[in-house]
């Protein structure tokens, strides 16, 4: 069998794990660097691969939603990460949420046991030599030494934003005399625990939250404490106005406790409905751990315990993990990388995952899949691929690359991370007025393209060039 150049992957997060697996599955040897546990990051709690440091949710599951379409594209492309997410999913209404411990452990075991993947548990302090095919998948918590080398290589100032994680509590510490199980609008199973607030308890909670003590930022962080809008700390939301949380994570619409009476009786509904509702989502398959949805925070731990125990039903909450905030680094990718995820000035170097400025777990996986697939093709001497912009993976890649689709971003001072959304897809050939039907058309078009791509890749893998 023909011997191909090996590929180095730096970082065993979601993108790096996916990339390494795709490369090895193509018959190429991989050296995978992961600095944990030898060197810990500010946000990770374990040394497992693909650890989820923020939420345990990959977003909406339905493929007529942007996040769900991205997941479905990755399923079609045989993503190891999405396969494990499906395997270790936990009830979460219409979302794909996972038992984060089992999920990460399974990916670690699968990747580590692949005969073509060599794991090096050490920091990679600098970029490998130019002849070595390399994927940078170090994520938003790139080590200082490597970040410095990347900065020197790109000649660009680093970009960053602040991200935060929600607290996790034990299920047995929830008071179900007040809290109750339900899903919004009673759709599907009652997968969420809901803690209702009346107007008085909400006002008191808001008052304490906006004056609570926050964990101190380092001096260099204070200068530019930018937050990503999709993951704002709850205290930052509260400071925007007393009603802001009620139109965000504490939205009460569509949530009803049967103990309050008949939801169809308007007089009862007006009298009993909650002013605000805090929701908790299951963290593990056994239902022993629950996270506070939307409660990313940078409050001091003592303040978290004091204030979050003000939530009805959580007065005796036992905290397994407190919320934390950390600095996320990403490159100004529209100036630096191609739609193949190769650096313009070094074709043997790829970037993948949140380092490129995509936002969300599935988007990181998508970057890992594309970078891994292209690195394997490059190692075999074959042409790399770009994905159609009508697919969610292709649209996200175009947004963070120097393609025509991202020229609108190229000259802006502040390039900011982008989550999966239908707004970045090109218009349909037909006019569809109904939004839900329009999203289904986007989905059908994207999945047709992805299936064609899958067939093309299968043809490439069976080509005589690869024997």
From Swiss-Prot:
Q: Has the keyword Metal-binding been applied to this entry?
A: no
Tell me where on the tree of life, at the top rank, the source sits.
Bacteria
According to its UniProt record, which protein family does this protein belong to? Belongs to the MnmG family. TrmFO subfamily.
Give its E.C. classification number. 2.1.1.74
Q: What is the lineage of its organism?
A: Bacteria, Bacillati, Cyanobacteriota, Cyanophyceae, Synechococcales
The chemistry this enzyme catalyses reads:
uridine(54) in tRNA + (6R)-5,10-methylene-5,6,7,8-tetrahydrofolate + NADH + H(+) = 5-methyluridine(54) in tRNA + (6S)-5,6,7,8-tetrahydrofolate + NAD(+); uridine(54) in tRNA + (6R)-5,10-methylene-5,6,7,8-tetrahydrofolate + NADPH + H(+) = 5-methyluridine(54) in tRNA + (6S)-5,6,7,8-tetrahydrofolate + NADP(+)
Keyword line: Cytoplasm, FAD, Flavoprotein, Methyltransferase, NAD, NADP, Transferase, tRNA processing
Localization recorded for this chain is:
Cytoplasm
Q: What SUPFAM superfamilies does UniProt report for this protein, alphabetically?
A: FAD/NAD(P)-binding domain
Name a GO CC annotation attached to this entry: cytosol
Q: So what does this one do?
A: Catalyzes the folate-dependent formation of 5-methyl-uridine at position 54 (M-5-U54) in all tRNAs.
Keyword Amino-acid biosynthesis in annotation: no
Q: What is this protein called?
A: Methylenetetrahydrofolate--tRNA-(uracil-5-)-methyltransferase TrmFO
User: Which cofactor is recorded for it?
Assistant: FAD
Gene name, Swiss-Prot/TrEMBL: trmFO
- GO biological process entries: tRNA methylation; tRNA wobble uridine modification
InterPro entries listed in its UniProt record = FAD/NAD-bd_sf (IPR036188), MnmG-rel (IPR002218), MnmG_N (IPR040131), TrmFO (IPR004417)
> Main localisation, per the record?
cytoplasm
UniProt cross-references to HAMAP family, sorted A to Z? TrmFO (MF_01037)
Which Gene Ontology molecular-function terms are recorded? flavin adenine dinucleotide binding; tRNA (uracil(54)-C5)-methyltransferase activity, 5,10-methylenetetrahydrofolate-dependent
A Pfam family annotated for this UniProt entry: GIDA
Binding site residues for FAD: 11-16
